[in-house]
Design a protein with these regions (language model features):
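Acidic catalytic/metal-coordinating carboxylates
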Residues: 47-50, 73-76
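Active-site beta3 strand of CheY-like receiver
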Residues: 58-64
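Receiver (REC) domain active-site loop signature in two-component systems and cognate sites
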Residues: 69
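Short, conserved "switch-loop" micro-motifs in signal-transduction and mechanochemical regulators
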Residues: 96-97
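C-terminal output helix
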Residues: 100, 118-127
Length: 145
């Protein structure tokens, strides 16, 4: 896997993620990527209902969420999370790249969209963009060099 500069919050702590996808493989793949970026997985969910519960429980810095899932789809879950937490950062990660789905997700509060299969360099740049001024690239210490 390609290496990337570590992304951290402005307070020096790791960016905390909630990863939501009904595919365990997809969740693990995305989790592996964000951990390589220096992130911390604080929760996982396989459907929109569980995503809402996990968001309330973990208050992550960012949610990476699939669109098509059982019980409640990602767009509806994103809308409900943003309604309760207006500053929530949600990035939709889906193979369903129809323009109407992307537009609907953005209208309901998602901040960005990443097409599956996820490319780590694209996910990294999207995370940097969505975190904005609340994130920084960690400067290596002498021990890490």
């Amino acid at each position: 896997m390609e290496t990337f500069p570590i992304l951290i919050r402005k307070d020096g702590m790791p960016i905390r993620y909630l990863v939501v996808d009904d595919s365990v493989f997809a969740r693990k793949n995305v989790a592996k990527m964000v951990e390589a970026f220096g992130g911390e997985i604080v929760g996982e969910a396989g459907d929109g209902c569980t995503a809402i519960t996990e968001y309330d429980r973990t208050t992550p810095d960012m949610v990476l969420m699939d669109i098509t899932m059982p019980q409640m789809e990602g767009i509806e879950a994103a809308e409900r999370i943003v309604r309760s937490h207006p500053t929530a950062r949600i990035v939709m990660v889906s193979s369903v790249g129809y323009q109407e789905n992307i537009v609907a997700a953005l209208q309901k509060g998602a901040r960005h969209f990443v097409q599956k299969p996820v490319k780590s360099e694209i996910l990294y740049e999207v995370i940097k963009y969505v975190m904005g001024d609340d994130a920084a690239v960690a400067t290596p210490t002498a021990q890490e060099s």
